[in-house]
Amino acid sequence: PTDEQYRLSRMIAAYAQIKSECAAMKNRHHAAKDEEAAKAYAEIIKAMNEQLEVLKEKIKEQTEKPNCKEGVKRLETIPAIGRMTAAVLFHHLTSSKFETSNKFAAFAGLSPQQKESGTSVRGKGKLTKFGNRKLRAVLF
């Protein structure tokens, strides 16, 4: 990956980490029994949300750089894929080289798997739970 792609991946990782911490902080805020603690949690949540917005803007700026722009724009042509989802997909597509689309689908945990025993096949195939959890979470 180029320096621009590496910066994009670091920003995406930071965004995901802060978003996860913000969700945990919201749970603490909800469970707080003390008014002062709840107030402190609310201030922290507000600061985290502001930082998430700043990071989102920086990610958008990074996707406008020459090494990222074309790939992200192509991914955005897919229905229901926005800038953030396209940026995450672009990061995963460029950080690993996939020989076929089937290999990428397996990496993302989007390939169907059938349950079979010997010659019998039980039911229809379902999506596997294998693959990259973070990538699958962005897509669903």
Features from the language model and the residues they span:
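Long, charge-rich intrinsically disordered scaffolds of nucleic-acid metabolism proteins
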Residues: 1-74
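Phosphate-backbone recognition surface of nucleic-acid-processing proteins
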Residues: 83, 87-140
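Residue-level signal for short amphipathic helical patches enriched in basic/charged
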Residues: 32, 36, 66, 81-84, ...
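Short, well-structured alpha-helical segments
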Residues: 42, 72, 76, 83-90
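A short alpha-helix capping/helix-coil boundary motif
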Residues: 7, 52-55, 79-82, 115, ...
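Residue-level recognition of specific faces of alpha-helices
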Residues: 7, 74-77, 103, 138
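Cytochrome P450 C-terminal beta-domain/meander region
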Residues: 71-79, 126-130
